[in-house]
Amino acid sequence: MDAAGAGAGGKLKKGAAGRKAGGPRKKAVSRSVKAGLQFPVGRIGRYLKKGRYAQRIGTGAPVYLAAVLEYLAAEVLELAGNAARDNKKNRIIPRHVLLAIRNDEELGKLLAGVTIAHGGVLPNINPVLLPKKTAEKAAAAGKEAKSPKKAAGKSPKKA
């Protein structure tokens, strides 16, 4: 029998699980790190089980869901950052998040029924309420004809 106590009568220390008793313990690696994600795979898996969405939850389900949530968060944050930069701000506020979501076709469709607190509304003026463009052009043309400089410049030559 060897000295580690793995003989017929000897037992391994509790929690040794496949390594020699008293050997160096490997550092634990989270499933988020293994998947290369920032979002917590373990916590999402716990929520899936606790929520009773199904009797059984596969091992890949929380990893996939964490990846999808991380992608959506990154997409919204990137667009909100662009909106903040467009408004010459360094900090993202709820208004920037709303502008980012509502101006993006796919995110707008996904989050159509979502209300964002302190987000405000999209700037929108009904075209009927805007002044007529033809009236503006006619008024501008009329002003040009009555301008004294223009009239002086187009005087006929004396013969």
Swiss-Prot record:
GO biological process, one term: heterochromatin formation
Motif (SPKK motif 2): 155-158
Region (Disordered): 1-29, 136-159
Record-stated family: Belongs to the histone H2A family.
Native organism taxonomy: Eukaryota, Viridiplantae, Streptophyta, Embryophyta, Tracheophyta
Top-level taxon of origin: Eukaryota
Protein name listed in UniProt: Probable histone H2A.5
Organism: Oryza sativa subsp. japonica (Rice)
PANTHER family reported in the protein's UniProt record: HISTONE H2A
